[in-house]
Swiss-Prot record:
Organism listed in the record: Arabidopsis thaliana
Keyword Iron-sulfur: no
Protein name (database record): WAT1-related protein At5g45370
Localization (cell): Membrane
Membrane-crossing residue ranges in chain numbering: 26-46, 49-69, 82-102, 112-132, 151-171, 206-226, 240-260, 273-293, 297-317, 320-340
Annotated membrane topology: Multi-pass membrane protein
Lineage: Eukaryota, Viridiplantae, Streptophyta, Embryophyta, Tracheophyta
Length: 381
């Protein structure tokens, strides 16, 4: 089903809506390129924590001045609730999201890392139900479709985790020949302890990477689920992104100081510096700024809907630049994830359109059709 692209009234114009859709397309294209760039950096042997620290500091140095000068007149006062919400956004959306992604990517490949990202919208829906911000009526078709789509999507994620299958395209994964080098030489004690713990339980490195990527998706889902109501109370989107990066970078720096033992790990080669610049400027500052603004305009339902663009972009780029193969398990699991995703979003939009039609009759035609499905107050506005 095609997602509604126009908001009838509300606080966003049709031009802003079109710009937000274009922005989210750009975000996912950049994310696909980021998967390839970071895989190359990991293969060279850059320390994951050090990479994240430099990336976050660079992004914060861009977002903080922009937020300070552009939103000084519209930034609401800070309170305890907003403070802790922003801290959580930094913990989940910056620290957990980035670190788990890099750990997962180092043990899999860019195609696989991108193929599992479409599970983010369904994880967002599950968290919204647990938080009580999304209701499911199992007596209606929409509610049944939501539950069915969630199960289909989770089944796809499980299939990707348990079934790798033969390579459909490409040859031997370039990452296989360097994994041991990456693990032995480059990664901090935090990573080594985590990996050794899972290896002791019978997991291999591929499945450890898959678990890290699932954790990465859940962190991003939590980030979107919490960010939507925060933007209602604190509509300065650049400030929300900057504060999130401030808290996330602070946690990342503290973790790096504790677990990065080798001074040489803090020195970067020229190619690693270029990877950090791409990650900090484009995949962090630009992407998170656009994502936060689009979340304010479109809502998390539509923002999450753009994640399925990542697998195609990443697969295309990684096959060209890395020679990474595309596995049967990734294809089958990705198909299930995307099918489940569209089942959930179709049911959500059906419910929203029904609610909007009722509100138009009861009040006026100035009603938001594309209301975020992870946030709903008592009045339904």
């Amino acid at each position: 089903m095609a997602a509604p692209a126009i908001l009838n009234g509300g606080d966003a114009t049709e031009r802003e809506t079109r710009m937000a859709h274009s922005a989210m397309t750009l975000v996912q294209v950049i994310n696909g390129g980021y998967h390839v760039v970071t895989k190359v950096a990991l293969n060279v042997g850059v320390n994951q924590l050090v990479f994240c620290v430099f990336r976050d500091l660079l992004a914060l140095s861009i977002l903080a001045p922009l937020a300070f000068f552009r939103e000084r007149t519209i930034r609401p006062p800070m309170n305890r609730s907003i403070f802790f919400s922003l801290f959580f956004l930094g913990l989940a959306g910056i620290f957990g999201n980035q670190l788990l992604f890099l750990m997962g990517l180092s043990y899999t490949n860019p195609t696989y890392a991108a193929a599992i990202q479409p599970s983010i919208p369904v994880f967002t829906f599950l968290l919204a139900v647990l938080m009580g911000t999304e209701k499911v009526n199992l007596l209606k078709v929409e509610g049944q479709t939501k539950v069915g789509g969630t199960l289909v999507c989770v089944s796809g994620a499980i299939a990707m985790a348990l079934f790798r299958g033969p390579a459909l395209f490409g040859g031997k994964d370039a990452a296989d020949s360097v994994k041991s080098v990456i693990i032995d030489r480059s990664q901090p004690e935090l990573n080594g302890w985590l990996v050794s713990s899972f290896l002791g339980l019978g997991f291999d490195q591929w499945h450890i990477g898959v678990l890290c990527l699932i954790g990465n998706c859940m962190c991003m889902a939590a980030f979107l689920a919490v960010q939507a109501p925060v933007l209602k109370k604190y509509p300065a989107y650049l400030s929300v992104a900057a504060y999130s990066y401030f808290f996330g970078a602070s946690i990342m720096i503290t973790t790096a100081i504790l677990f990065v033992r080798e001074p040489k790990d803090w020195s970067l080669t020229q190619s690693e510096v270029l990877a950090v610049i791409f990650a900090g400027v484009f995949a962090s500052a630009l992407n998170y700024g656009l994502l936060t603004w689009s979340n304010k305009i479109l809502g998390a339902a539509l923002v999450s809907l753009y994640n399925p663009l990542q697998p195609a972009t990443s697969a295309f780029l990684s096959t060209i630049f890395l020679g990474s193969p595309i596995y049967l398990g990734s294809v089958l699991g990705g198909i299930l994830i995307i099918c489940g995703l569209y089942m959930v979003t179709w049911a959500s939009y059906r419910e929203q359109q029904t609610t909007s039609a009722g509100n138009e009759i009861a009040s006026s035609s100035d009603v938001r059709i594309s209301e975020p499905f992870i946030y709903r107050d008592e009045t339904g506005k």
